[in-house]
């Protein structure tokens, strides 16, 4: 049984009070808005405008006596709020010690919270159709007072697909296959919520529960083929621009993703989906001193499933990957000099994750809850090197990120209001810990 802290009780009370204020109203599903259609051509738009208040209370990135923390850090740079609470001194007979706390409050808008997509469709024949989409996200519009100097736009997607009776050929910058099976599970609870903001004082708006079980697939240039669906089954494969990281050079081979999925509606209220995914990519680095070329293979497997019955939705998944972090393939994280996906010797670390969500929707109200965990296995190179009995070049690698959350939302036509709470815990291999509570309220307009 989980015992809530005083902070957790205050946040839960705030969310319960806010949730009661949402007004009962009919809801509809959003759809593309077609504003031009003629002679087999159509132009449509889709988008999202959102603003979320988020309060983060808990621990800042912890100190370490093992050189540096790798992975899991949430601050850029470190932000604390003085002496937050007194704790028992580990040295017997000594007075209590002060433990700094984190208190951050932001109104977030931009990035995931502000999107505009424009697409063009063309019917070449009755059985051959082309679809396309260019989706633009604003890097950040939270403030003009230096919370984020960069005000650029991010062309997140730019793809076209050719649908034929023999299958679909899709090309351009698009969501990658491996890890994308997390999305249907995450959306059960975080369709309109923020969750973990990735970095609490950085302007990005939403990581949801990614990093503690679910993966973020990411976007890159691809050539993808999808077979026709038969008895609910479909196979997809894609070759993609390879990922590179600090001190790694691009390889002569593209990354390969593949998926076998099952999607079947047994009635108007009963639908089942299953996703089995894999990824393979060679990575390489040339030692500038010895000119030695070192190669490795990023290899991962992923599986998830979602079942919808009437207003209920339940889903879960798991994965393991060599050369992945807790959030994505070949993850670097906040510290580019200490990436999570590989160590100082450029050996690839292995990570794994598990996650699940359940929710119920009635009259446009959705109440959902879930939990997840991700784990990182250190390499032999992560062991401390002792010099005079003191760790000299050692690191403390992230051991685990775990979380549980509750979200509540109300859809009113094209508007969606949300309230949420999340408890996030990081633990590193030498015992460093971090617990953070996230709470938020949001408003979304989507089309």
Question: Where do the PLM segments sit?
Answer:
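Sec/Tat signal peptide C-region and signal peptidase I cleavage site
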Residues: 24-31
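Outer-membrane beta-barrel "beta-signal"
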Residues: 258, 410, 435-447
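Detector for outer-membrane/organellar transmembrane beta-barrel domains
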Residues: 63-67, 98, 258-406
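Outer membrane beta-barrel
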Residues: 33-53, 77, 99-244, 252-254, ...
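Transmembrane beta-strand segments of Gram-negative outer membrane beta-barrel proteins
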Residues: 36-92, 192, 274-276
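Transmembrane beta-strands of outer-membrane beta-barrel proteins
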Residues: 43-51, 122, 126, 130-134, ...
